[in-house]
Structures are given as structure tokens and as C-alpha cells.
Amino acid sequence: MTSFPHPSTSESGPDPDSEPNREEQAHAYCLRLLTARARTRAELAGKLTQRGYDEPVVARVLDRLVDVGLVDDEDFAEQWVRSRHLYAGKGKRALAAELRRKGVDDEVISSSLADIDAGAERDRAERLVRDRLRREKLDDEPGSDLKVKRRLAGMLARRGYSQSMALDVVTVELAGERERRRV
């Protein structure tokens, strides 16, 4: 039976705080974050800085991730807009605000929002109002329409639709729903 000597404490491995090792740790951390969902360069930079990584290490790691295509703010913005507009019913203003919070450049934001035309935005607003109106109790009391209009216009405003579009859509859809219920 052969025995191996115990590793010497004086011959320790690489210093865990050395620059190359810190860079690899930061890279591994970014990869773990990216497995959950796509992230912007600014989001990853914020997470790394929060963890205490130095600016040069952060820049090198993010440059590596951009070079291999794992971080792409333009692609992120396009996917975000498509997903949040379709599934969450967000309007252009709300989407732009969300992307700004995630650190996406204004130029990239405007190009990704260009895919949503006014007709598609209005169609989505109409569907949202129609769905909500089906569950809404509509009274014949005076002033009840005003309450419903305010509630629905507020819902659309919180989702980032313009006030003029919200009021127009709510007025048209409310009239249509009243007509549908009369028949």
C-alpha cells in the first residue's frame, strides 16, 4: 500500500484573490445569472459591482460575454418588448421605462419599440378593456359609466398607454359592451 504525503501548507494553490481567479469567479457568477434569464450588460455590471468586483474585472468579464454573444442588449430589448407587450399587455411608455431601469440605451429602446405600430398597440388595449369589461358590473345608475371609465382608463395608463388612446378605447368598448348586454 502506497501512501501519499499530505499537501504542504506552504505549497498552497493559486491565491483566491488573485486577479485571474477573481475574473473567473466573476465569469462563473455571470453564467449562473444568465442561466435563469437573459440580462443586460448594465444588470450584470450592477450585480458584479454589488459583489465587490473591481471595475477592470467587470469590464473584461462583460466584454468576454458580449464577444461570445451571451450578452446582447439589442436582442434582450427586442425579446423583452415582444414578450411584455404580448403577454403583460404593456404599452410603449411602460416598456421604455422598464428597459431604461434595466440599463438599455435610449437608441436601442427606440429601435425595439419601433416594432410595435400604433394599430397593434390599440388592438392590445382594446383586448385588455374587453376582457376587463366582461367581468365588470355595469349599472344603469347615473355616473356609473364615469366610474367604470376612470377605472379602465387608469388600468391602461398604469400599463403605459397614452391617456388619449385609453379614453378613446374605453369609451368605444364600453358602448359596445352595453350594446352587447342589451341584446
Swiss-Prot record:
The keyword Cytoplasm applies. GO terms for cellular component: cytoplasm. Its main location: cytoplasm. Keywords: Cytoplasm. Residues 1-12 have a biased composition (Polar residues). Residues 1-26 are annotated as: Disordered. GO terms for biological process: regulation of DNA repair. It is found in: Cytoplasm. Belongs to the RecX family. NCBIfam families: PRK00117.3-1 (NF001056). Modulates RecA activity. This is Regulatory protein RecX. It comes from Mycobacterium sp. (strain KMS). The gene is recX.
